[in-house]
UniProtKB/Swiss-Prot annotation:
Name of the protein this chain belongs to: Pyridoxine/pyridoxamine 5'-phosphate oxidase
Encoding gene (name): pdxH
InterPro entries (UniProt xref): Pyridox_Oxase, Pyridox_Oxase_CS, Pyridox_Oxase_N, Pyridoxamine_oxidase_dimer_C, Split_barrel_FMN-bd
Keyword Cell membrane in annotation: no
Family from the record: Belongs to the pyridoxamine 5'-phosphate oxidase family.
Length: 217
């Protein structure tokens, strides 16, 4: 960074004027409100509305984040898929505590979730794997996620090789590919407001139900 031509970002800001979130807008079950917001994100044609930041912690206590696509949600939690040799999967084996974050900037909204990750069954993984486009199934075989490689050509050559190999018939599920369901412990809904007096509501698991609290911005 040039000392004589510093890129000043301190004054980059905008006003949040898309309305508020009031207690009367809330649902008893947070997944109902999540679904409403997700549908509105899709209707607004946001790019990748199911993209979420997944945060895990390694054995040294160092947090790590990456963007992953949400593929399913229900009363049992939020579901995503990954290579089981990836950094995230290894970290979840050591510490299944996890957080998810949906940044719907264009709607001045965020949803933050904390919980515990549980491995999906082989049947659940297989069902989803075979619903994916064929090239995506092949790519799962090609990439040993997070492994160091010297050139992109290695991936492309392997992809073409496996595309020929799997030209006919069903592509088998790799043993190193799976998924997780995140059981929900807290879920926070954030709505941007004027003068930075944002609306925040926190749902916290309370037995079979949810405790709901408004948080100061």
């Amino acid at each position: 960074m040039s000392e004589n031509n510093e890129f000043d970002i301190a004054d980059l800001r905008r006003d949040y004027v898309r309305g508020g979130l009031r207690r009367r807008d809330l649902t008893t079950n947070p997944l109902d409100l999540f679904e409403r917001w997700l549908r509105q994100a899709c209707d607004a044609r946001l790019a990748d509305p199911t993209a979420m930041c997944v945060a895990t912690v390694d054995k040294s206590g160092q947090p790590h984040q990456r963007i992953v696509l949400l593929k399913h949600y229900d009363a049992q939690g939020m579901v995503f898929y990954t290579n089981l040799g990836s950094n995230k999967a290894q970290q979840l084996e050591e510490n299944p505590r996890i957080s998810l974050h949906f940044p719907w900037h264009m709607l001045d909204r965020q949803v933050s979730i904390t919980g515990t990750a549980h491995r999906l069954t082989a049947l659940e993984v297989m069902k989803y794997f075979h619903s994916r486009p064929k090239d995506s199934q092949i790519a799962a075989w090609v990439s040993h996620q997070s492994a160091r490689i010297s050139t992109r050509g290695i991936l492309e050559s392997k992809f073409l090789e496996l595309k020929q190999k799997f030209l006919q018939g069903e592509i088998p599920l790799p043993s190193f590919w799976g998924g997780y369901r995140v059981s929900l412990e807290t879920i926070e809904f954030w709505q941007g407001r004027e003068s930075r007096l944002h609306d925040r509501f926190l749902y916290q698991r309370d037995g079979d139900g949810w405790q709901i609290d408004r948080l100061a911005p």
